[in-house]
């Protein structure tokens, strides 16, 4: 159901980390050197989390390391050697076969069409609009669509309940919905704004909110999850909802004809039910 969301992106899995010549990636070498793999069941996840940290940061403090691996669980409780392995990366020369091929990779990605996507096959539909206007047009011709952004909640319906989602509209390519605006009296957060971006922004104004967001899932979840998704699913375990309720936040909803403003305390009706009608979106 979610495979088309990979369009235009580079997918790197743990098997890709070893070079074609069989040379281990610096992250893998560190894990071996510090005996950071116990039973091995969780090792691929830790390796990929540290690989992401390795590629996106220039130095690795213990706080950053712990945050980077927070989405992984080692039942053997072998965290000390894992953290030691990660710290040792500060002493390595930051290069790998991905860096050597980066120009080629970027060139290939640029050749991929960036136009909106529409897939209809075997009674299943998938749309990926680029603008709000395109989204509105798709909604008009598709009854009861399932909106998808980060998919951190929706994906459980597929992986746990084995549900088949027939009519998906992927929102993550709509840049108009990815923003943070601050005025004198309030902060506006776009529906598509990743939690990780908001987490970094909000520290200056509400450090306690930042602290809570750091406990929200893991870096992987916060990289794709959105506050609007947290609100729209009306989950009783939505991490941001108690804070948004206490701040008397407002939700802006696009209806068929206009945009309406709803106090968040009035937005929720009951368990996993909101005032959003079919075709309306935040």
Enumerate the language-model features and the residues they cover.
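Membrane-interfacial loop-to-helix junctions in multi-pass transporters
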Residues: 22-24
